[in-house]
Structure formats: C-alpha cells, structure tokens
C-alpha cells in the first residue's frame, strides 16, 4: 500500500510519499493543487493491483480531491479500483488519518524489534491506540478540524489489511517529524507538549 498524490495544474505531474506534503506543496505555490490519496499496491510486475479495502471501509479508502477528481476516479474505476471524490476538508481529514497511521504504527513497531504492522495491531494495540488518540488530538487542534469517531478502529482495520508490512521510523521529516514540529512549536511558546508520548518514544529510540 502507499500514499500517492497527484498534482494537476496546467498539466499532470506526479509525486508520492507516505507523509505530510502540505508544507512542501504550499512552499511551491501548490496549496490548492488537485490531489489523490491512493491506497493500492502491485505485488510484482504484471500482477493486478490490490485495492485498499478494509473490514471497516469495504468501499475502499482511495480518494481524490479537486477539479480533476471525478476524471481520476473514473479512470481508477475503469481499472477495477475504488476511488471516492471528496471535498477539501474531508480529503484533508483522510490524509491526516493516514499520516497518523504510519506515524503511530511505525513508532510503536520500532519499540518492539521485528514487529510487523499486524503484530503491532494484535499484541501492542493499547500502545498504538494511545498514540493514535494523542496524535489525532494534536492534528485536530493544529488544523482546526474534528475527526470522525472510532479512528483507532479504522486504522487498526487498515493494519490488518497490510499486516505483513515491516515497521521502522523513517522518512522522519515527512512523517513523525510533522508531529514533532508541533511539539517544538508548543514548547517554544511555553505551552505543554501536545504529543508527550510521541516525544518520549522518539527519545527512547534516539530519533530526536
């Protein structure tokens, strides 16, 4: 599975990463660019793509936003893949949920060497759910939005769909780094750390 973001302006360009791209997009004058959040994967060359469907979201998780969203969705549907067309706020919330997923599951997994995403979901669920709640609260406060209830259930369901994935804290700038930047900003302003558990575990692993 992956996050894939398509940026359409006067022409189609492509960029992809498992992480927070909003600051980078804004720095390039692309804050309003059309985007696609893709949840599908190809196991190997020639294999059909595997759609990102879970037991809590059987309709699929892939989503598109912007002027060309309907056209992108139609092309994905033609290829047998799901795709929802969302407004900007709904898309942003789904993007942030995926960021929370990868930041939380990778960090908890790294605390337990050898743990896959599936092992984290089964054996360390209380740890990862505590972190999900903390990161969701920080993200909601920063962006001024409200997430739908039961995020932990949705993210655990996604983890069951990609249970074989290994865990590691990497691409820090794009993933956990965004949440750590909220910590740094709060502390610089003399405010409490909005992500104390996240910060403690990053320090435990000597990431920061």
Predicted regions mapped to residue ranges:
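Active-site-proximal catalytic alpha-helix in oxidoreductases
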Residues: 90-134
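Short, surface-exposed loop and linker segments with low hydrophobicity and enrichment for Pro/Ser/Thr
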Residues: 5, 90-101, 189-196
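Low-complexity, flexible helical/coil segments
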Residues: 23-28, 46-54, 120-122, 136-143
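Helix-loop-beta segment of a Rossmann-like dinucleotide-binding subdomain
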Residues: 45-60, 112-121, 159-167
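ATP/pyrophosphate-binding catalytic subdomain of soluble kinases
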Residues: 65-95, 101, 105
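Rossmann-like NAD(P)(H) cofactor-binding subdomain of soluble oxidoreductases
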Residues: 1-50
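NAD(P)-dependent Rossmann-like dehydrogenase/reductase catalytic/cofactor-binding core
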Residues: 70, 74-77, 81, 126-208
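Short beta-strand and adjoining strand-loop segment in the mid-core
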Residues: 38-77
């Amino acid at each position: 599975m992956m996050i894939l973001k398509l940026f359409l302006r006067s022409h189609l360009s492509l960029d992809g990463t498992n992480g927070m791209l909003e600051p980078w997009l804004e720095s390039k004058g692309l804050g309003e660019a059309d985007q696609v959040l893709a949840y599908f994967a190809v196991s190997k060359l020639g294999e059909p793509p595997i759609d990102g469907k879970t037991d809590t979201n059987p309709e699929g998780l892939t989503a598109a936003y912007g002027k060309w969203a309907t056209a992108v969705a139609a092309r994905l549907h033609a290829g047998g893949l799901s795709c929802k067309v969302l407004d900007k706020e709904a898309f942003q919330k789904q993007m942030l949920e995926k960021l929370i997923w990868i930041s939380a599951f990778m960090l908890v997994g790294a605390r337990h060497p050898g743990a896959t995403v599936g092992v984290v979901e089964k054996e360390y669920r209380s740890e990862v759910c505590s972190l999900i709640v903390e990161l969701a609260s920080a993200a909601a406060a920063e962006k001024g939005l409200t997430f739908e209830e039961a995020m932990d259930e949705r993210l655990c369901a996604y983890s069951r769909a990609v249970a074989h994935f290994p865990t590691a804290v990497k691409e820090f700038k794009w993933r956990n780094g965004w949440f750590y930047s909220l910590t740094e900003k709060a502390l610089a302003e003399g405010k409490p750390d909005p992500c104390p558990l996240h910060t403690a575990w990053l320090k435990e692993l000597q990431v920061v």
